[in-house]
């Protein structure tokens, strides 16, 4: 955590989020005769994601799923996945394009991309769009854990909610959230921290140094 060039804190919790996916189910889709995308290596942009999701939805009965994506619940236990995490992507690409790290208001350069991803989540889902107001985070986790959906937008912290069910650990993977931005084929996973170790600059020099020595030992 920096203020200019000055280090203000060091992260002690690193978390990553994206599209958690079921490898076994995705491979079943790749093997379909009419699959437009044939391998995970080809699934590296929004256009490919849409082809895969549409194909899964079209063949959901044959694949044994209820939908490509888990339900996009909009209650408080789930809506943050989209109002915050998904929304970070269009903001990131706008800031990157403009060469800035903050602004008083976004221009909305990538709002159409945001809408396209959200529409895909709703259209190729385990539930009808009219049901999202009643769907919860627990519903989405359960749908993925029981093998009812191929994709589940969430992060590393969700592992405890989906482990030891129908999806084996070795069948879990994570893809970046693709929104159709230029160059996203090289995009990585969204990774960061909300938790940092900091040292109180108003403490005594002795305590500051002892704390820094301790943190050096810890890390």
Regions found by a protein language model. Give the residues of each.
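A structural signal for short loop-to-beta-strand junctions that line the ligand-binding cleft
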Residues: 1-26, 184-190
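Beta->alpha turn/N-cap motifs
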Residues: 137, 154-159, 177, 193-195
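Extracytoplasmic/periplasmic solute-binding protein
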Residues: 2-13, 17, 47-103, 149
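Short, solvent-exposed loop/beta-turn-alpha elements that line the ligand-binding surface or hinge
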Residues: 38-44, 73, 91-116, 164-166, ...
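Glycine-centered hinge/linker elements that transmit conformational signals in sensory
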Residues: 50-55, 98-134
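Paired acidic/hydrophobic, glycine-rich loop segments that form the ligand-binding mouth/hinge
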Residues: 150-154, 173
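Extracytoplasmic/periplasmic substrate-recognition and gating elements
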Residues: 126, 165-219
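Short helix-initiation/N-cap motifs at beta->coil->alpha
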Residues: 43-48, 131-146
């Amino acid at each position: 955590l920096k203020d200019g060039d000055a280090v203000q804190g060091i992260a002690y919790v690193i978390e990553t989020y994206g599209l958690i996916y079921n490898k076994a189910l995705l491979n079943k889709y790749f093997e379909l005769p009419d699959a437009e995308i044939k391998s995970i290596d080809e699934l590296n942009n929004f256009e490919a994601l849409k082809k895969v999701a549409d194909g899964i939805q079209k063949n959901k009965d044959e694949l044994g799923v209820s939908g490509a994506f888990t339900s996009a619940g909009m209650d408080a236990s789930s809506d943050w996945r989209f109002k915050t995490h998904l929304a970070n992507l269009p903001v990131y690409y706008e800031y990157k394009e403009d060469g800035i790290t903050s602004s008083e208001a976004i221009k909305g350069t990538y709002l159409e991309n945001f809408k396209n991803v959200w529409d895909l989540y709703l259209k190729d889902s385990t539930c009808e769009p009219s049901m999202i107001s009643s769907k919860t985070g627990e519903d989405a986790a359960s749908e993925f854990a029981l093998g009812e959906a191929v994709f589940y937008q969430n992060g590393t912290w969700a592992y405890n909610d989906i482990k030891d069910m129908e999806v084996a650990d070795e069948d879990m993977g994570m893809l970046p959230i693709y929104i159709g931005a230029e160059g996203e084929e090289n995009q990585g996973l969204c990774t960061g921290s909300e938790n940092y170790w900091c040292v109180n600059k108003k403490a005594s020099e002795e305590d500051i140094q002892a704390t820094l020595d301790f943190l050096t030992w810890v890390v």
